[in-house]
Curated annotation (Swiss-Prot):
Residues 233-259, 385-404, 410-445, 473-503, 653-692 are annotated as: Disordered. InterPro entries: Kintoun, PIH1/Kintoun_subfamily, PIH1_N, PIH1D1/2/3_CS-like. Interacts with CFAP300. Interacts with DNAI2 and HSPA1A. Interacts with DNAAF4. Interacts with DNAAF6/PIH1D3. The gene is Dnaaf2. The keyword Phosphoprotein applies. Its main location: cytoplasm. Keywords: Cytoplasm, Phosphoprotein. This is Protein kintoun. Transmembrane segments: none annotated.
Amino acid sequence: MAKTAASSALEDLDLSGEEVQRLTSAFQDPEFRRMFSDYAAEITDPENRRRYEEEITALERERGVEVRFVHPEPGHVLRTSLDGEHRCFVNVCSNSLVGAPSSRPGPGRGGTAAGSHWSLPYSLAPGRQYAGRNGNRYTVYDVVFHPEALALARSHERFREMLDATALEAVEQQFGVRLDRRNAKTLKIKYKGTPEAAVLRTPLPEGVRAQPEGELPGLLPYPPYPYHYPAAAESTARSPASPAPKAVQRPEPTEPRCSVVQRHHVDLQDYRCSRDAAPSTVPHELVVTIELPLLRSAERAELEVKGKLLCLDSRNPDYRLRLSLPYPVDDGRGRAQYNKARRQLVVTLPVALAVARQDFSTTPEGPTAETGTDNIACTSAGDLAGAREESADSSGADHGRKSCVVAPDAGTAKAEGELVPEPEQDFGGDSVTPLGPGEGTTPENRSLLYSAFQSGDAESLAERSGVYGDLSVQTSEEQEGTCHDTSGSDMGGPGTESIKPLCPPLQCNQDEDSLTLLIQVPGIQPQSLHGDLSPFSYELCFSTQDSGYSFTLQFAPENKLSTKEPAISISLNNAVIVLAKSPESHGLWREWYWGLNKDSLEERLFIDEENVNEFLEEVVRSPLKPARSLSPPLIEVLQVTEEQIQIHAKLQECSDPDGLQGKEKGVKEECPLSEKENTEHSTTSTADSNSSVAVEGLKINTCGAVGLQQGCPDVPHVLSGKRLQSEAKMDPEFIRESSTAYSAEEKENIKEPVITKEKKIGGDHLSSLPNKTAVQNTHDFDTIKETNMQDGSVQIIKDHTTHCAFDFQNSLLYDLD
């Protein structure tokens, strides 16, 4: 303990480098160490101490003041806390120089029986600081009474309580501190710290002693006296009459000191040079530090956190705290830690962001400025605007009409994320029916949201000042309502017509524990993102300046997503979303399903060894005659990367005896198997003189297109894929498809009737395209095989007739025909 106290005292010394060097060199001198030891022994010698007190007494008597040194005799010790920060000890001591206690009879208060009014003289010494075992400092005060007072306290319990209360009150009034009376405890020890004598100064009746005649004055004047000289005519100091004692009441539990710190997580994307980049004013965590200097263990404390209220109760010592927090917190994820060295309870509480934004948005911030002619304010309480108030704008003499689509907050929504239906409300003539439980993901219900985005509300949200919400997509557990301004319907504004959402171009890559979605749409408005995440699917809708988009992503039952909030990064040209895989589904997945909604999903394959082999088998496979046998083709994989696959296939046998041997077949795909938004098929046929040759390209620019592949025994195929260009709009191109002409013998072998069938590709019927020629695709066999180039699935069709656009690419081909 002495070592710790010495080290703490040395740490408090403010020494310069020169002083440290001089002290170091001095203590290295043996003569200096001997002299320093003699000095320490001299000042600690009791005899020298007595001589020092006699000299001080004589000097003070010459000044007309009687000085008496009060040496405290041990009594008992009170332990409490000082200003709620650290421990404090009050030594209740005795000395015969202090006045004896006295009492006088007096009437009781409030109709109580008559009693005795006590007067308890005491002497105080300034507080002294010591260092504890852990380096923590504590303060010690000495309150000295007459020995008779301590004798009465030992024999009467109520008198002892009065004596202790008087000692604590004297320290508070004299030194201006606050002691914890409720948790004051009497220790078994008799004295704490090192005893130090106090001084009692009383003026002498005769005043200052006159200087004798003939005595020369001193060369130096007396040093200034630090205390005020009392008048000689005044009598000796009397103990002030103590006020009438108050009714003895047990004090209330002590309210400990506490501090609340708001902790934010720094994210560099909040400091980009962009309108949507702004740090949120809502903190991520609240750190509450509670000072409990008398609490030895956290087992005696009871902590409860609910919503925005923190409650702490403790018995022995008695603490009671009711703290109102600035933000609602998630008590289920909070943690508390008690620091025994500092006697502090540190509680870390994550802020419930969704509830905090809703509470902040509903809190009035004073009178809002009137805008427009209707003076109606529409409040948005969702992830679109974080937490801020919006003023609705309207133009013209007529009052604008408001329509809001409001979803229940997270507290009223079900676990599956269903929306609780609300009754219809009339907002100035435009009534909106709430969405039902199963209508939240259909494109028809999303059209109202997109029409509101087109009216300029989404852009205005980013421009308004205030608290910006996180750009993270809300999960099914944190669904919040959005309110959109659709005023101007009577004026023929852009909000009068609902825009059907489009399916955006999407690329999906994977690793062992996450999926990365690349949405190649430029100009995405961050505040328009609305997502719904579940273990088996992910739905997202957003909008740009000109249009709205929506897509649904699903996976196999054995592949599950984590419900962790997705990470979203938005740039000027695209958006990247990272979805975490569930821990039990880590690894490489085989396929994924994607489409505009759940009714139009398509299967997509990830790039792995199994899918590549299956794709190669589908490419080289053709519906040949059973009697015709081909040698296995020579397949050579030139390059397999994330962005490109190059395959070289060489056939060993051709049905045409005059044809070329060893025809080469090249397959090149410039994008992953999962990215087949735009595919281009080129077919080149070489046959005898009775056959015609046609070269055409089939280009499909749609979200759910299906490519037709018709096998011919002696026709090599070249498949090439092109990455979707990131333009906002592209004019649809004509669909061109070729069919080979067959010889007369082959036409006679056709036995099955031909059935006309129209196929809808990209939303347009082929029959509606200009310059179309109906061509019957006939073959030697009863069936034909249709291969979907997007997922490799094969469909067998017995009777099939297709309508296609027929176009010649070369004038020589036209002459040959």
